[in-house]
UniProtKB/Swiss-Prot annotation:
It comes from Schizosaccharomyces pombe (strain 972 / ATCC 24843) (Fission yeast). GO terms for molecular function: alcohol dehydrogenase (NAD+) activity; ethanol dehydrogenase (NAD+) activity; metal ion binding. GO terms for cellular component: mitochondrial matrix; mitochondrion. Its main location: mitochondrion. This is Alcohol dehydrogenase 4.
Length: 422
């Protein structure tokens, strides 16, 4: 395959050639609260960069993905998806492409918008019954996260709750190929999976080097039919990934470069994609934006926007991207008390195209973008109740994503942020 002549692009990761290096220290960098040192004369600390070993981009790359699955030797796969993907015919298209490569296909299509422990267990039953040697997820973060949970249990055993936190597994998961249909979560290329525990109404954050797909596929043609509301929510999710990664205590020059380019692309193209889903330039660039944001937070991790948003999604069932959109400016206003974070928010203002390069300008532009893409900006409009704050705060403070926030807030401070977003 000639990359220069191909209508799609391929990105390979050095991780496939040096796996011991890329599985060694990145997690330690953010669980220990590693501080950004780009402006210091001290030597940079040892870090690593996680990315799937094989990534496909561009119109028409879906067919190439099927060939790559065949070349990897897989013969019996489970497709994990949701009813919406079935309805629009994308499942049938992928199934046909795989069957052309003599790959047997099984289906689990029960994934919910916030995938649950029950979803994971149902999919796992099919994997065991059919003795699948691989999995393919089709969709956005919900399908990919659910598939990661299934794949992890297929090889490691136990319950999915056993893997909440950071690097709790001991074995690589069942090989997973992730076909992405939204420009936001970047779950097709990260080591993060978020699973809802139905009985406790909380979201469990699983951050594990073994959950990364072996192949990610971003074919913009699969995104053209995405409705405006979902385009807006997933796009704001991508922006949140980039902003949180940039102010993270585990940021490094590589994640910084990915984050700021993501911020620029979202600022330029998200509203266009929301206004006209058939705008190919906007869709293509949002696909790149979400992948860049994924590379940033997959290695620098996140912060309290996600730690808090997970609780809103688990408790009320609010779409994840909407939660992030509403909380992003409020959490960053709190973070701006930290001098380093304040300066970095000024950088973000520059990349958002603001005339003034200040934290305040960045927050104003973020709030403006939320309105431009027609997301309701207040939690009260989404059904959030102040009487639930204490429970939400308790769970947010236990969320692994908060470990790299610029400031570790108190219970009362997290509660105040929730209140400010009402």
């Amino acid at each position: 395959m000639s990359i220069l002549r191909s209508p799609f692009r391929l990105i390979r990761s050095p991780a496939r050639f040096f796996p011991s290096l890329f599985h060694s220290s990145c997690n330690q960098s953010f669980t220990n609260g590693l501080k950004h040192q780009s402006t210091s004369s001290k030597a940079m600390p040892v870090s690593a960069f996680y990315i799937p070993s094989f990534n496909l981009f561009g119109k028409g790359c879906l067919a190439e993905a099927a060939k790559q699955i065949k070349m990897s030797g897989f013969k019996n796969t489970l497709i994990v998806t949701d009813p919406g993907i079935i309805k629009v015919g994308l499942y049938d298209k992928v199934k046909a492409l795989l069957e052309e490569q003599s790959i047997t296909v099984h289906l689990y299509d029960g994934v919910q918008p916030n995938p649950t422990v029950g979803n994971v267990n149902q999919g796992l039953e099919i994997v065991k019954k059919e003795n699948c040697d691989s999995m393919v997820s089709i969709g956005g973060g919900s399908a990919h996260d659910c598939a990661k949970g299934i794949a992890l249990l297929a090889t490691n055993g136990g319950k999915i709750a056993d893997y909440e936190g950071v690097d709790k597994s001991s074995k690589p998961q069942l090989p997973l190929i992730a076909i992405n249909t939204t420009a936001g979560t970047a779950s097709e290329m990260t080591r993060f999976a978020i699973i809802t525990e139905e009985t406790r109404h909380i979201k469990m954050a699983i951050i594990d080097k073994h959950t990364m797909p072996i192949l990610s596929v971003n074919d913009p043609e699969t995104m053209y039919g995405l409705p405006p509301s979902l385009t807006a929510a997933t796009g704001m999710d991508a922006l949140t990934h980039a902003v949180e990664a940039y102010v993270s205590t585990a940021a490094n020059p590589i994640t910084d470069a990915c984050a700021v380019k993501c911020i620029e692309l979202v600022n330029k193209y998200l509203k266009r994609a929301v206004d006209n889903g058939k705008d190919e330039e906007a869709r293509d660039n949002m696909a790149y934006a979400e992948f860049l944001g994924g590379m940033a937070f997959n290695n620098a991790s996140l912060g309290y926007v996600h730690a808090m948003a997970h609780q809103l999604g688990g408790f009320y069932g609010i779409p994840h991207g909407v939660c992030n959109a509403v909380l992003l400016a409020h959490v960053q206003k709190f973070n701006s008390r930290d001098p380093r974070a304040n300066a970095r928010l000024g950088d973000i203002a520059f990349h958002l195209g603001c005339e003034e390069h200040t934290a305040e300008a960045a927050l104003d532009r973020i709030s403006q973008l939320v309105l431009e893409v027609k997301i309701r900006p207040h939690l009260v409009d989404l059904g959030v109740k102040e009487k639930d704050f204490d429970v939400l705060v308790d769970h947010a403070m236990k969320d692994a994503c908060g470990a790299t926030n610029p400031i570790q807030p108190t219970h009362d401070e997290v509660k105040a942020i929730f209140k400010s977003a009402m």
